[in-house]
Amino acid sequence: MRQNFEQIRPMLSDKADLLQVDALEAWTESSFARLQPLLDQRAANGSIRECHGDIHLGNATLLNGDVVLFDCIEFNEPFRLIDIASDAAFLAMDLEDRDLKPLSRRFINAWLEHTGDYAALDLLNFYKAYRALVRAKVSLFRLGQEQQMGL
């Protein structure tokens, strides 16, 4: 996560934006320290698995009434070998980002009922924040590229 903050900061110049990034980084660091025992436990109990790695609405479709995911991250194993709760949190974050919070809650409730992984509840906000941070970083990279191209 630190790498994301290191990459984002140079792309920002507005003092309010930088203060917000500082606050998010402080929250992230304290949350990580608080959650470390649970993260270690999940690593030991098999919750870290090869996952999709990029579950958001742009990588999902309905096919014959079933949700089908596509375009998983195949090019980078560390992006795929993640906590299964991180994969679920990405979709929840994407739904919330699109003002679909009730659908996000329904998804998380169904996911919890299906997996029984209620211990993951303590991690969801942390993982959603991580995924939102990555999305912000990618958006800033794209904006920088567009500005360089004069778009």
Residue ranges and their predicted role:
Residues 1-56, 60-151:
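ATP-dependent phospho-/nucleotidyl transfer catalytic cores
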